[in-house]
Amino acid sequence: MKTLLLTLVVVTIVCLDLGYTLTCLNCPEMFCGKFQTCRNGEKICFKMLQQRRPFSLRYIRGCAATCPGTKPRDMVECCNTDRCNR
């Protein structure tokens, strides 16, 4: 009986861990308050700053499977904990 109970506890813990989803900020503004639950396979939050023209900046935040690449003059920061891309 104890073995069965222990087995059920272990299976429950493993199943709960598999269902974890990351939460990241997701908006195109500098000051952001909108959160997104990442899809399965997206384990990275990112914050990207793109400079398109002099004095023209674009902010992008969201979820990704891998850290996004950048172009010259762009900056990106990646992290893997909830709401870490502030």
From Swiss-Prot:
Q: Cystine bridges: which residues?
A: 24-45, 27-32, 38-63, 67-78, 79-84
The record's section on InterPro entries has: Snake_3FTx, Snake_toxin-like_sf, Snake_toxin_con_site, Toxin_cobra-type
Q: Which residues form the signal peptide?
A: 1-21
Which tissues carry this protein?
A: Expressed by the venom gland.
Task: Give the molecular function GO annotations.
Answer: acetylcholine receptor inhibitor activity; ion channel regulator activity; toxin activity
Q: Which SUPFAM superfamilies match?
A: Snake toxin-like
To which protein family does this belong?
Belongs to the three-finger toxin family. Ancestral subfamily. Orphan group II sub-subfamily.
Q: What protein name applies here? A: Weak neurotoxin 9
